[in-house]
Structure formats: structure tokens, C-alpha cells
Amino acid sequence: MDPLVASASVLAAALAIGLASLGPGIGQGNASGQAVEGIARQPEAEGKIRGTLLLTLAFMESLTIYGLVIALVLLFANPFAS
């Protein structure tokens, strides 16, 4: 493999996983904080808020997993390598 392609692939993989985890991490923190605040205001709605929160966190985490898959493809099954 060309050293330039190899180094660009490693850099792209690092950016893919880094940027893919940045947004969902911030979003998960905000969502969790708002859920705790909502449960504190209305304790009787705790079950509904918690269920919605867990579903939302799963959707957010899937974005990070997509970034991880792209990074693994770039590192181990690079389509740009000859």
C-alpha cells in the first residue's frame, strides 16, 4: 500500500470516530440532563420519560457506531488501497 494512502486512511479513521462521537456525546449529555430535570419536576412521569430517554440514547449511539464502522473499513478493508 502506498504510504500516503495509508497515512491518509489512518487520519480519516481518527477523524471519523472522533467527529462521530462528538455530537452524540453532547446530545446524550443534554438529553440526560433534561430527563433528570423532567423527572424531578414530575416524578409520576418517571417511567414514560425514562423509556423515551433510553430509546433516544440508542438512536444517538447508533451514529457513533456508524463512525466506528467507517473507521474500521478505512483501516482494515480500505477501498482506496490497490
UniProtKB/Swiss-Prot annotation:
The chain crosses the membrane at residues 3-23, 57-77. It comes from the Bacteria. One of its GO terms (cellular component) is proton-transporting two-sector ATPase complex, proton-transporting domain. The keyword Secreted does not apply. It is a multi-pass membrane protein. GO terms for molecular function: lipid binding; proton-transporting ATP synthase activity, rotational mechanism. Keywords: ATP synthesis, CF(0), Hydrogen ion transport, Ion transport, Lipid-binding, Membrane, Thylakoid, Transmembrane, Transmembrane helix, Transport. InterPro entries: ATP_synth_csu_bac/chlpt, ATP_synth_F0_csu, ATP_synth_F0_csu_DDCD_BS, ATP_synth_F0_csu_sf, ATPase_proteolipid_c-like_dom, F/V-ATP_Csub_sf. The keyword Ligase does not apply. The record marks 61 as: Reversibly protonated during proton transport. It is found in: Cellular thylakoid membrane. F-type ATPases have 2 components, F(1) - the catalytic core - and F(0) - the membrane proton channel. F(1) has five subunits: alpha(3), beta(3), gamma(1), delta(1), epsilon(1). F(0) has four main subunits: a(1), b(1), b'(1) and c(10-14). The alpha and beta chains form an alternating ring which encloses part of the gamma chain. F(1) is attached to F(0) by a central stalk formed by the gamma and epsilon chains, while a peripheral stalk is formed by the delta, b and b' chains. Belongs to the ATPase C chain family. F(1)F(0) ATP synthase produces ATP from ADP in the presence of a proton or sodium gradient. F-type ATPases consist of two structural domains, F(1) containing the extramembraneous catalytic core and F(0) containing the membrane proton channel, linked together by a central stalk and a peripheral stalk. During catalysis, ATP synthesis in the catalytic domain of F(1) is coupled via a rotary mechanism of the central stalk subunits to proton translocation. This is ATP synthase subunit c.
